[in-house]
Amino acid sequence: MSQSLIVALDFPGKQEVEQFLHHFEGEELFVKVGMELFYKEGPAIITYLKEKGHKIFLDLKLHDIPNTVKSAMRSLASLDVDMVNVHAAGGSSMMKAAIEGLEEGKQEGKERPICIAVTQLTSTSETMMKKEIGIEKTLEEAVAHYAKLTKESGLDGVVCSTLEVPKLREVCGNEFVTVTPGIRLASDDVNDQVRVATPKRARELGSSYIVVGRSITKAENPLEAYKTVKQQWEGVTV
């Protein structure tokens, strides 16, 4: 189950990544590379991480016209990443185009990357969604709507908060992948995320993957923090 624990490499550049990964010599991690790091270092950071034996969730949240997204996904698949994402708000045609691009770009003999869609950012509250985005549904209804659209479009799952996982299991079934950021140890600050949960709570609610950043990356001892999160996520009593 440790391979379903994704560590967010929210660093400004490769030097900071190298310093962080020094704590994990011999560990094969599942890491998330987001916009900040990828836009700074480019595909070279993916090559570096792959050479270290790590799995990669390339978190770029594509949202554009279908043809552009298809072409972009073709390029991303050629990097041999393991997971990618789009914004569900881009619509069904865009999401279907994303899958087409991944199939065309995947490396020979390999499966295409897992493709998931962002429903609502974990920094979004229901009040913000209604007042600023103009969606009149409840947050749970909006997330369920996007999740259903995502499944119908042929994607593997969604990014959502842990709070929405039980509802999505009802709507989309148990095989539908749920990737949940906003994971914190009970002693940590929530920072800029609104809908957060502990690793234990994420497990209880049925998340497929959890994404953990600051609780590990900002810890005094990142490896020990990683082990603590892993134990809580896997339900190990120590």
UniProtKB/Swiss-Prot annotation:
PANTHER family: OROTIDINE 5'-PHOSPHATE DECARBOXYLASE (PTHR32119:SF2). Keywords: Decarboxylase, Lyase, Pyrimidine biosynthesis. The active site is at 61 (proton donor). One of its GO terms (cellular component) is cytosol. This is Orotidine 5'-phosphate decarboxylase. The keyword Lyase applies. InterPro entries: Aldolase_TIM, OMPdecase, OMPdecase_AS, OMPdecase_bac, OMPdeCOase_dom, RibuloseP-bd_barrel. It is an enzyme of class 4 (lyase). Its EC number is 4.1.1.23. It catalyses: orotidine 5'-phosphate + H(+) = UMP + CO2. SMART domains: OMPdecase. Belongs to the OMP decarboxylase family. Type 1 subfamily. Pathway: Pyrimidine metabolism; UMP biosynthesis via de novo pathway; UMP from orotate: step 2/2. Substrate binds at residues 10, 32, 59-68, 122, 184, 193, 213-214. SUPFAM superfamilies: Ribulose-phoshate binding barrel.
